[in-house]
Curated annotation (Swiss-Prot):
The gene is RAB16B. GO terms for biological process: cold acclimation; response to abscisic acid; response to water deprivation. Coiled coil: none annotated. Residues 1-136, 145-164 are annotated as: Disordered. This is Dehydrin Rab16B. InterPro entries: Dehydrin, Dehydrin_CS. Residues 25-53 have a biased composition (Gly residues).
Length: 164
C-alpha cells in the first residue's frame, strides 16, 4: 500500500514547485530505497532519508534580481551592407565571419577600390580630393566606366608619372 501513496500519506498526484504535475518517472515515485525509507533514487540523485525523506530538486535556480548582466565585450558588425545598386541587403553568416577574421576582407577591397578611385585618394589616405603634384583635377573620370574594371595595381600604376 505504501507504493500507491506519496510522501506523508498524500495521494500520488504531486506537483513540483512550479505547479507542474510530477509523474513517477521524474523523481522515482513509487520505488523505495533498499533501506526501507522514503528516499527514492530518481533523476535528482539524492538518495537516503537523512533529511526527513524529503525530495530535493536536482537543479538550483539562480536569480539575478531582475538585473540583466552583460559581458564587457562589445561587437559592432552591421547586419546589412551596400548591394552596389544604392540599396541595402542583409549579410549572411559567412560574410559576418569573414569580416571578423584578420585579412579576410578580400570581398570588401573591390568596394573600397571603387570608392577610392572616385575621390582620387591613394592607398592609406582618407580620400582627400586635393593632391599635391601636377594633377589635372579629374582623377575619377577614368573609373566611371562600369564595363572596364581595373585592378588595384593598375590604379596605382596610373597614378605614377611617366607610365602612360
Amino acid at each position: 500500500m505504501d507504493n500507491y501513496q506519496g510522501q506523508h500519506g498524500y495521494g500520488a498526484d504531486r506537483v513540483d514547485v512550479y505547479g507542474n504535475p510530477v509523474g513517477a518517472g521524474q523523481y522515482g515515485g513509487g520505488a523505495t530505497a533498499p533501506g526501507g525509507g522514503h528516499g527514492a533514487m530518481g533523476m535528482g540523485g539524492h538518495a537516503g532519508a537523512g533529511a526527513g525523506g524529503q525530495f530535493q530538486p536536482a537543479r538550483e535556480d539562480h536569480k539575478t534580481g531582475g538585473i540583466l548582466h552583460r559581458s564587457g565585450s562589445s561587437s559592432s558588425s552591421s547586419s546589412s551592407e551596400d548591394d552596389g545598386m544604392g540599396g541595402r541587403r542583409k549579410k549572411g553568416i559567412k560574410e559576418k565571419i569573414k569580416e571578423k577574421l584578420p585579412g579576410g576582407n578580400k570581398g570588401n577591397n573591390h568596394q573600397q577600390q571603387q570608392m577610392m578611385g572616385n575621390t582620387g585618394g591613394a592607398y592609406g589616405q582618407q580620400g582627400h580630393a586635393g593632391m599635391t603634384g601636377a594633377g589635372t583635377g579629374v582623377h575619377g573620370a577614368e573609373y566611371g566606366n562600369a564595363g572596364e574594371k581595373k585592378g588595384f595595381m593598375d590604379k596605382i600604376k596610373e597614378k605614377l608619372p611617366g607610365q602612360h
